[in-house]
């Protein structure tokens, strides 16, 4: 079985890891200049650096579908700079997972593959996909919805260590981002993490810098550009999060259940 995942940020990468460990081949696509924050646990980093490793799984940039197939045979997870997912026709996946997390559907259709799964708000099971996986922290995180939609976006990050919106760092203006600190650094409230066109982006809480944009990424004012973890555990920076694992588990359930159902086994 082959699963094609649109998006290769940390949540999408959690889904990719769980599918891969269940014996399902995975190919991922993302922007040519990815905007993932938690880059140490996002397979999108392979697009920028050629390859990356997350929890022992090696991801490698592929230039086209043929190269992606070759990398799969070699045991690596291919990642393509292909935001429109044009590789879908040649790859002909058994399942397509839209994990872009745009809070809206950017073009995924229910007939894109035999199994189509939408991650988070913006999708409706039975209309533009076969199943939706909940991404809102709380009782329903990771739950698979086979009819209807995920909870609407609140624009308020989930609580971690007692903090919600305060832990997210946002660009102070439009421009090009340049980091001062690196992922895993211990930072203090009020400390400058990076600059956009000379304007500082400062921490609002103390903790460990769990995520930050790569140097040279174009940003818009207010765009999420960093993430401080108040739990102060640097090891969390290099391991897939509880949320990504929960969402990933929901993706695995959806893919396997819908596959079994199509075969008359459920």
Feature-to-residue mapping (PLM):
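Well-ordered secondary-structure scaffolds
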Residues: 1-266
């Amino acid at each position: 079985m082959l699963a094609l995942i649109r998006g290769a940020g940390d949540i999408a990468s959690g889904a990719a890891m769980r599918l891969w460990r269940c014996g399902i081949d995975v190919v991922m696509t993302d922007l040519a200049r990815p905007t993932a924050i938690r880059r140490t646990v996002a397979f999108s980093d392979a697009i920028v650096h050629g390859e990356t490793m997350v929890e022992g799984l090696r991801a490698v940039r592929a230039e086209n579908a043929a190269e992606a197939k070759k990398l799969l045979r070699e045991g690596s997870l291919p990642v393509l700079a292909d935001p429109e997912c044009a590789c879908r026709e040649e790859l002909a996946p058994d399942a397509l997972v839209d994990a872009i997390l745009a809070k809206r559907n950017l073009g995924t259709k229910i007939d894109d593959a035999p199994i189509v799964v939408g991650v988070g708000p913006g999708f409706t099971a039975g209309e533009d996909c076969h199943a939706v996986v909940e991404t809102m922290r709380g009782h329903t995180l990771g739950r698979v919805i086979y009819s209807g939609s995920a909870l609407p976006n609140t624009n308020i990050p989930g609580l971690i260590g007692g903090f919600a919106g305060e832990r997210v760092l946002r660009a102070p203006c439009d421009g090009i981002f340049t980091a001062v600190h690196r992922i895993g650094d211990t930072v203090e409230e009020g400390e400058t993490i990076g600059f956009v066109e000379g304007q500082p982006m400062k921490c609002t809480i103390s903790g460990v810098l769990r995520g930050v944009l790569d140097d040279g990424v174009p940003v818009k004012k207010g765009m999420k550009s960093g993430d401080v973890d108040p739990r102060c555990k640097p090891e969390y920076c290099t391991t897939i999060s509880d949320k990504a694992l929960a969402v990933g588990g929901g993706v695995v359930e959806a893919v396997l259940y819908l596959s079994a159902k199509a075969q008359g086994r459920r």
